[in-house]
Curated annotation (Swiss-Prot):
Keywords of the record: ATP-binding, Cytoplasm, Fatty acid biosynthesis, Fatty acid metabolism, Lipid biosynthesis, Lipid metabolism, Nucleotide-binding, Transferase
Record's GO cellular component terms: acetyl-CoA carboxylase complex
Organism name: Citrobacter koseri (strain ATCC BAA-895 / CDC 4225-83 / SGSC4696)
Gene3D superfamilies: 2-enoyl-CoA Hydratase, Chain A, domain 1 (3.90.226.10)
Leader sequence residues: none
Function: Component of the acetyl coenzyme A carboxylase (ACC) complex. First, biotin carboxylase catalyzes the carboxylation of biotin on its carrier protein (BCCP) and then the CO(2) group is transferred by the carboxyltransferase to acetyl-CoA to form malonyl-CoA.
EC numbers for this chain: 2.1.3.15
Protein name, per record: Acetyl-coenzyme A carboxylase carboxyl transferase subunit alpha
Domain CoA carboxyltransferase C-terminal: 35-296
GO molecular function: acetyl-CoA carboxylase activity; ATP binding; carboxyl- or carbamoyltransferase activity
Length: 319
């Protein structure tokens, strides 16, 4: 897969272009008198070191760009890589099947679990079909239906958060967007089965929180979680989206800051360069964290789970 490089990764992109060029020359003419393998190896090492140096000092805006990377793994990628026997379940049994939310039953290391997550889509047609990962009310009602099913069958719930926010269209508002989100918050706080939530990309406002009330809340290293996008915040405060980098720093949208504020429990480290560089390794780390979280929650009673989760939700907004 050819990598898409972000603006701040251009020095890495230039090195990788040199490596690709040398590799192509080597393949085209195997009778070259010169051995370029050593030079390719040297450039690869230099690329790794440069990547390590750049990623050691990322700002919040750069992390926000990584969270939106077009090649970043989405919910269905992690379902394929970390789970077995996934059976997707569709529809809210009231209006429609919202493709921006996917969900179904799968096995995690042999154990049945209910998976629910946002799905953005990659190609243009799929992005439109998934509404760019912005759910309508029927998406959140589908999610709630699956959560209630999981409770009936005593299955842990695992959610993957990756959305710029709930869809703000007129039709969505007419069908009760705010009510659907609010109902999910209330009902998730009352579930008697373990709930583990992981932000895998963008965690945008109520659209993220509507499937984000859990006993354990994790974030991938280069994901974000905020009440509004940096561009939206900048447009309100400075009347210009160009101030988005400044807004991103001020909002505290990155995982270390959110863990410091006790809004999340764990930060799952990503492969060097981000999850899109090695989805398989990222899925393995994510799976290990989910299994560890389930082991911690299995020893708690149903009442303890509900009480702890409710108190956690009520603590949001307090320093």
């Amino acid at each position: 897969m050819s990598l898409n490089f972000l603006d701040f990764e251009q020095p890495i992109a230039e090195l990788e272009a040199k490596i690709d060029s040398l590799t192509a020359v080597s393949r085209q003419d195997e009778k070259l008198d010169i051995n370029i393998d050593e030079e390719v190896h040297r450039l690869r090492e230099k690329s790794v070191e440069l990547t390590r140096k750049i990623f050691a000092d990322l700002g919040a805006w750069q992390v926000a760009q990584l969270a939106r990377h077009p090649q970043r793994p989405y919910t269905l990628d992690y379902v394929r890589l970390a789970f077995d026997e996934f059976d997707e379940l569709a529809g809210d049994r009231a209006y429609a099947d919202d493709k921006a939310i996917v969900g179904g039953i799968a096995r995690l290391d042999g154990r049945p679990v209910m998976i629910i997550g946002h799905q953005k889509g990659r190609e243009t047609k799929e992005k439109i079909r998934r509404n760019f990962g912005m759910p309508a009310p029927e998406g959140y009602r589908k999610a709630l239906r699956l959560m209630e099913m999981a409770e009936r069958f005593n299955m842990p719930i695992i959610t993957f958060i990756d959305t710029p926010g709930a869809y703000p269209g007129v039709g969505a508002e007419e069908r009760g967007q705010s009510e659907a989100i609010a109902r999910n918050l209330r009902e998730m706080s009352r579930l008697s089965v373990p709930v583990i939530c992981t932000v895998i990309g963008e965690g945008g406002s109520g659209g993220a929180l509507a499937i984000g009330v859990g006993d354990k809340v994790n974030m991938l290293q280069y994901s974000t979680y905020s009440v509004i996008s940096p561009e939206g915040c900048a447009s309100i405060l400075w009347k210009s989206a160009d101030k988005a980098p400044l807004a991103a720093e001020a909002m505290g949208i990155i995982a270390p800051r959110l863990k410091e504020l006790k809004l999340i429990d764990s930060i799952i480290q990503e492969p060097l360069g981000g999850a899109h560089r090695n989805p398989e390794a990222m899925a393995a780390s994510l799976k290990a964290q989910l299994l560890a979280d389930l082991a911690d929650l299995d020893v708690l009673s149903k009442d303890d789970l509900k009480n702890r989760r409710y108190q956690r939700l009520m603590s949001y907004g307090y320093a």
